[in-house]
Amino acid sequence: PWRFLPYTDLSFTAAYFDQSGLYAYGRQPDAALWNLTRLGGALTPVAETDALNEGLQTFPQAFERAMVEAFFARLGLKPAGEGDFDFIVALLQWMEAARIPFERVFFDWFGGAASTMRALAGPHAALYSDAAFAPLRGKIESFAPDDPSRLAHPYFGGA
C-alpha cells in the first residue's frame, strides 16, 4: 500500500483496524520483531528458550541487510557496504520531511548518476536542487548502477 501514498509518511498505516499505529510503515521492524517474539513464546513448549532467543537476536542485522538489498534494488544501485543502511534511513527521513511521493524518488534516481538529468528536469527538481538533499544526491550519484541498460526501458523515457 505504500506505493500509493500521496507523500512519504512513515506514520501512515494502511490497516483499517490499527488505531494505535502498530503496523505503520516506520514501525514495521518493531512490529515484525514483536510478532517473532510472540511466535518464539508459543514455541517454548517444543524448543529450547536459549535457541529461540539466539534466533531473535539475529533479527535486527538480518532486517538491516534485507532493507539495504530491497532499497538498493528499487534504486537500481549496487550497495557499497558500510553506511548503506544509514543512507537509507537518511533518505527516508528526507523523503518524509520533503513530503515527496514515496515512489517518486525511486523513479527519479533509478540508476544513480545516470538519472541526474531526468531527476532535475522532473516535477520535483526544486526539492532535488535544495541544500537539504545535496548530501543524499552526492551519495546516490556515488553508488554504482546495478544494470545501466535498464534505463533504456520506455518507462524511464518521461517524467
Give the role of each language-model region.
Residues 21-159:
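Regulatory N- and C-terminal appendages and interdomain linkers associated
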Residues 2-17:
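Flexible glycine/proline-rich, aromatic-decorated loop/lid segments
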